[in-house]
Amino acid sequence: MIERYSHMRWVSGYLERRAGDVPNTYVAEYQLSDLMRKGLIERNAGQDFLNSAGLLDFHWSITWPEDFDVPDEMLVNRIGDVAGYVVFVHGWTGNMHIWEELPGMVVNKQRQLVAISIDHNGFGKSLFEDKTPPLQSCNPPAAMRTLQNFIELIKIRRQRGETRTKVINFVGHSMGGATLFYMNPMLWNYGEVTRMALAPALLLEDESHRVFYTTLGLGIGILQRLPVLELVERFIKPSVFRTLTAGASDRVKDLHAAQYSDTPKGITGAALMAMGVLNDYEIARDFTLMRVMLGHRDPLVGLVNMMDLLGDLEFPAKNIHVVPGTHYMFSIGSETPANAYLHAQAREMVVEDIVNLHEEAMRMQKVGPRIG
């Protein structure tokens, strides 16, 4: 069979392939070092990517809709011949699994999309080389540069000679949502990229939460150097994770607790401090294809301060959704039936927003920019 998307040969080199959590979807997982070893990603390019981000490795998965199990020899063309990709970017102490059914729901809603869920910024299986990385290596602007480089590495943008229009749709939560504000529109073509920020922890105008993240990050970082304080951590950890994952499913709560335990304390502490001390206002005022969703009971992202910041950034009011819910407004927990009902509705809104953004971007590419 002729591979029309030979630049995406890495798709065939999955570590594992399985049925997805959502019916009629499939998932394949990838590790950059494994793809380099197999010759499916050029070794020098892969190593340059890791070196620029200070990472030991990079881990991701893809989710696609299918009514049957596509044979391996057809997989590259199947994943390449689409209208776009949805890149899911988790928050602190998260990993690519915190999204649960959301990637599958999106690709089932718009079957010309493929979802890519990543581990990033030192979490999951994308660990930093340095167990206590410098803050400028793990703050939102640095994470956005890594995302941009990753997209270029796996070549999912429209390549020279391709006839189809493609859109890259970013979806970020918490730290991942803040990351999306630092996208450089100069690196993208007209209508090529969209952004959906869920509970973005962008704290430029929120002094109380800045202090919270900075202090928490400093405290966790100290545990890396003074293990004797782990007794204190046993009392702090349950409270912190109750706050972070309030309203989320038990699975998400367990994932965060396990990820916290598995991640070097220096990495977790640095990621938190980087959000707390961030003072970078170099944010392009280009929000036509960006949406923000905020939860009214989010203890980690202050609603009033975030709305003030969005106003200062001249973010369009019509592109903001405030929904009844917590920091994890898209995860359906079992704490109360009312909370589960509200989060279920918010999750449906997230799916609709992602698909609508994608379709608007496609329309913009086909029509072209208006001049004059």
What do these predicted ranges mean?
Residues 269-308:
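Conserved serine/cysteine hydrolase catalytic core
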Residues 1-86, 111-114, 336, 351-352, ...:
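Alpha/beta-hydrolase fold catalytic core
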Residues 206-207, 226-285:
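Conserved alpha/beta-hydrolase catalytic His-Asp/Glu region
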Residues 325-345:
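Catalytic histidine-centered segment of alpha/beta-hydrolase-like enzymes
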Residues 142-166:
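Conserved acidic catalytic loop of the alpha/beta-hydrolase fold
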Residues 185, 194-224:
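Flexible "cap/lid" loop of the alpha/beta hydrolase fold
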Residues 91-94:
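Active-site glycine-rich loops that stabilize anionic/oxyanionic intermediates
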Residues 110-129:
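Conserved alpha/beta-hydrolase
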